[in-house]
């Protein structure tokens, strides 16, 4: 397994240009252990890359981080009775399609989120009440960097919260390898379930803006983030190469901005919302 320099631009859906000194794609546990052994000699931070739909590279070059993108053995989908085991690099949307095809009504929301399983678990991704990873995940398998071995965490041990988990809280401790999900709730009318899923997908596409974006910038609180941003957007700098979409005020669209430009836009927005509304906007996007 090679550890190389790598342009990171394609690994973030907002497409800010960035490069890494250290990057690797482990295809097996032994590859991952090799990467972690290398990391221990360099004392680098670790960042796991997935589909890139919730990440912002804030710098043009990284030399103190080992970027890891799991492939190979970590890309699988296996059904075993009332559980489905899915690898960390497997597409959440693809998993959703597979589960809908066999009548699993709890997994419509998988089809709406552009993430991989590992990233979705880390973020406790979801679309609303009753439609979060925590509601369907039974357990996860992860590599415990501190202990140097694979460990299994049950749902309650994952400490799932709104857009949070123990994995996110301890980024240099755990690496998600796979997750087990319950498939006990099945319906007989597959066509009706497929039609309902297609309708949800179409609705989501119609309400989301086009262009390079990482999706939601801030978490929602008692006042939706988009509503906060809408009230102060006229005071934001329109010439930085990125802007909040009028179609969805919590989405930043990138035209030609750098990571630094977008960070400045995020900070300015937080400052203005605090001044105007006395609300602290908390980042949902993962900033590296």
Which role does the model predict for each range below?
Residues 1-123:
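Anion-binding (especially nucleotide phosphate/pyrophosphate-binding) glycine-rich loop
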Residues 75-79, 140-142, 218:
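A structural signal for short hydrophobic beta-strand segments in well-ordered beta-sheet cores
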Residues 20, 64, 138, 173-177, ...:
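A generic structural signal for short beta-strands and their flanking turns/coil linkers
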Residues 3, 9-10, 51, 55, ...:
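Phosphate/pyrophosphate- and phosphate-bearing ligand-binding catalytic cores of soluble enzymes
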Residues 14-17, 41, 48-49, 57-60, ...:
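Solvent-exposed alpha-helices and their adjacent loops that cap or buttress functional pockets
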Residues 66, 122-126, 136, 173:
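DPxDG-like acidic metal-binding loop motif
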Residues 70-74, 133-139:
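A short, compositionally biased
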């Amino acid at each position: 397994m090679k550890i190389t320099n790598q342009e990171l631009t394609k690994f973030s859906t907002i497409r800010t240009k960035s490069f890494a000194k250290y990057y690797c794609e482990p295809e097996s546990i032994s590859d991952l252990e090799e990467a972690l052994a290398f990391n221990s000699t360099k004392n680098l931070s670790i960042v796991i890359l997935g589909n890139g739909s919730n990440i912002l590279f804030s710098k043009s070059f990284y030399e103190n981080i080992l970027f890891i993108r799991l492939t190979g053995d970590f890309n699988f989908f296996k059904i075993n009775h009332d559980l489905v085991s899915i690898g960390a690099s497997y597409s959440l949307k693809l998993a959703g399609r597979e589960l809908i095809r066999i009548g699993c009504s709890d997994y419509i929301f998988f089809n709406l989120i552009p993430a991989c399983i590992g990233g979705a678990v880390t973020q406790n991704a979801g679309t609303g009440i009753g439609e979060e990873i925590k509601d369907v995940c039974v357990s996860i398998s992860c590599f415990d960097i501190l202990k140097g071995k694979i460990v299994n965490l049950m749902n309650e041990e994952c400490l799932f919260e709104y857009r949070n988990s123990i994995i996110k809280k301890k980024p240099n401790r755990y690496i998600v390898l796979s997750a087990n999900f319950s498939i006990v709730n099945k319906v007989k009318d597959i066509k009706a379930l497929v039609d309902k899923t297609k309708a949800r997908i179409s609705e989501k596409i119609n309400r989301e803006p086009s262009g390079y974006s990482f999706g939601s910038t801030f978490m929602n609180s008692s006042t939706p983030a988009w509503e906060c941003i809408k009230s102060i957007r006229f005071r934001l700098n329109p010439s930085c190469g990125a802007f909040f979409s009028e179609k969805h005020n919590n989405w930043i669209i990138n035209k030609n901005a750098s990571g630094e430009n977008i960070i400045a836009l995020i900070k300015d927005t937080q400052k203005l919302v605090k001044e105007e509304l006395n609300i602290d906007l908390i980042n949902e996007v993962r900033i590296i």
